[in-house]
């Protein structure tokens, strides 16, 4: 049989799959995960201000009954436009966040603090919390560490 178009996502790799933790069948207790944060990760979010990044998100997941308590620690070096010259600047970031989820109920977001995961959900998707952590960690002033690292052509206009 011949198809006129390919099925959705045919041949595409799910770049965000490594950021999902299956919790069904996971034993109670503490579990540690290490997730690489790379340029492909941020390319998956079209609204991202970050051009590129290299780093690690360490997740400490505590499963207690039907509760999942995840602490996300992100350490990375991100590339984004310098506020002074618009050339790419590399900036180190660090951020810690906590994600709490309860399983077994309808999917809702309670006060933005606790996620309720329905019975059909079998994995905790941490891609969005990691993405948000990276953006929360960005400094308000995004410039090269040394002014002489700025693009000299643009710096000439500012002088």
Language-model features, listed with the residues they occupy:
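Acidic and generally charged, gly/proline-rich low-complexity regions
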Residues: 2-159
